[in-house]
Amino acid sequence: MKKGFTLVELLVVVAIIGILASFGVVAYNGYIGSAKKAAAISNHKNVCKYASAEAAKIEADFGEMFDGNITSGFIVDTYNDDGNPMGKVTQAAVKALEGSLENPYGDGGIGVNAVTDSGWGKARDLGYTIIDPQGPHDGKIGVLHIHTCIELPCTGDYKIPGGLDYILYCPIDF
């Protein structure tokens, strides 16, 4: 009478465990990818809401904007003097959001802050919410173009009506 398992039986069990584990790894990677994408989408929405609320402060002559990094008076005065305040507005927004949101895809060699005022068109831009300023036009002080790449490739014209599936975009008028 034999006791124990043969080598072939043990190899079959190990092979079955390996196959089951591979399904688990694939599913786990899918869950991680979905969570990162959801976090990038949430970051984008939060930045758009924040910038929109700050833009509303100009008409109300609220004073301090973007956590005190700029004032509505500075923006209006610069615009009225035929200047372009949008670069300073962008810098104020990025500074105000510094440290509050992290890029779920990692630092990409740029840093862990999810909000930046530079970049676009490279794989390292994945997950970053980028704020691009546009100066005065059509009677407006300017526009903050806020866009986030949520999957590769991170290239293309994000301002296209209807947009690209992998790029979230919201323009905020000032």
Where are these regions (language model features)?
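Membrane-proximal N-terminal amphipathic helix
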Residues: G33-F62
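Periplasmic/extracellular, small/polar-rich flexible segments of pilin-like filament-forming proteins
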Residues: A56-F174
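Generic cytosolic/nucleocytoplasmic N-terminal low-complexity/intrinsically disordered segments
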Residues: M1-K2, K36, S42, G87, ...
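N-terminal single-pass transmembrane signal-anchor helix
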Residues: K2-N29
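Residue-level detector of solvent-exposed, low-hydrophobicity positions
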Residues: V12-V14, G30, A35-A38, K57, ...
